[in-house]
Regions:
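Short beta-strand->alpha-helix junction loop in the catalytic core
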Residues: 134-139
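Extended catalytic core of nucleotide-activated donor transferases of GT-like folds
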Residues: 4-128
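Polar, enzyme-active/binding microenvironments
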Residues: 1
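A short alpha->loop->secondary-structure connector
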Residues: 129-133
Length: 139
């Protein structure tokens, strides 16, 4: 299975096991042998390049609202998951148009990956979508 990770991080490629800054998200990319791409590279990736894509929507996302990010992700990946960023309801402090965009984004993905049981319950109730735990991973 070909897996991709998409974030605002400005790097492309797989993460080696000896990476000097193995944060939780990077550890998951390493364990899954996922190829990371920054959002701005999406237009240059071939159609159906990946079986599964995992996305982290950043806290500062105004620029993503301006583009068809979900359309690009669906073009590149057969299935899409979003990995929760921060605590479960941080996005509710955003301007209303960003809140609506975020909920619509959640509704358009196939799977939501959560940090803990509280977040899992919250996102299941909010979206009625499949939600799974993706706990901290240390390598």
């Amino acid at each position: 299975m070909k897996i991709a990770a998409f974030t605002e991080g400005n790097y492309t490629g797989q993460i080696p096991r000896n990476h000097p800054n193995m944060r939780t998200d990077v550890a998951w990319w390493c364990a899954l042998e996922a190829t990371h791409h920054p959002f701005q590279h999406l237009p240059s990736i071939q159609d159906n390049e990946y079986d599964f894509g995992i996305v982290i929507i950043p806290k500062k996302r105004r620029y993503l609202i301006e583009v068809d990010i979900i359309g690009q992700l669906k073009r590149v990946c057969k299935k899409i998951a979003v990995m929760q960023e921060s605590y479960y309801n941080y996005w509710q402090d955003d301007p209303i148009d960003e809140q609506i965009w975020y909920v619509n984004f959640l509704m358009d993905v196939d799977l939501i990956l959560c940090h803990n049981d509280v977040d899992l319950t919250y996102y299941r109730g909010l979206t009625e979508k499949r939600c799974e735990l993706m706990p901290t991973l240390m390598i």
